[in-house]
């Protein structure tokens, strides 16, 4: 698959995300790997529902620097961290869905555990609803370097698959392709909504 096709698919996914209302008020950021050294990352302050390929900046994975001098998204360091930690990751999606944002505040533990839902099989490697999906929840931090360091430390100690939540902030997920990252996003968002509804009903 060519870089141009991957980027075109990412633009289409960004428009889909925008139509869903999952990146309101220009929030969120999305990227696709170019090669081992560079990725293409959405520019800061752009409406994700109206992006074109010109709205993506080439970013060096090792330094999180954009050679063009244009301003990449605030969470650039999280995208480059994922590409560094997971050589098989080729696309990263960071969104601000209401379910992810609220659920990340309800969960007081460092990890969210989800089980019993058939839709868990939308996540690569999950084959049954009987398994438990673990989604790490990290405290939000405006210091992206410090946040990236905590996530990297977690990944050294524990398995980190599919994505993670930032408390009061949103969801970051990834995949081996744009298509897989999109499936992980849609699957996790559905699971988060189910978890939210289940918790609400259990309180009645």
Curated annotation (Swiss-Prot):
Q: Which residues bind Zn(2+)?
A: 94, 96
This protein's pathway: Amino-acid biosynthesis; L-methionine biosynthesis via salvage pathway; L-methionine from S-methyl-5-thio-alpha-D-ribose 1-phosphate: step 2/6
GO MF term (any one): zinc ion binding
Q: Which free-text remark accompanies the cofactor?
A: Binds 1 zinc ion per subunit.
Keywords attached to this entry: Amino-acid biosynthesis, Lyase, Metal-binding, Methionine biosynthesis, Zinc
Named cofactor requirement(s): Zn(2+)
Identify the EC number(s). 4.2.1.109
**CC annotations in GO:** cytoplasm
* SS bond list: none
Glycoprotein as UniProt keyword: no
Reactions accelerated catalytically:
5-(methylsulfanyl)-D-ribulose 1-phosphate = 5-methylsulfanyl-2,3-dioxopentyl phosphate + H2O
Biological processes, Gene Ontology terms: L-methionine salvage from methylthioadenosine; monosaccharide metabolic process
- Annotated family: Belongs to the aldolase class II family. MtnB subfamily.
Functional note: Catalyzes the dehydration of methylthioribulose-1-phosphate (MTRu-1-P) into 2,3-diketo-5-methylthiopentyl-1-phosphate (DK-MTP-1-P).
Protein name (database record): Methylthioribulose-1-phosphate dehydratase
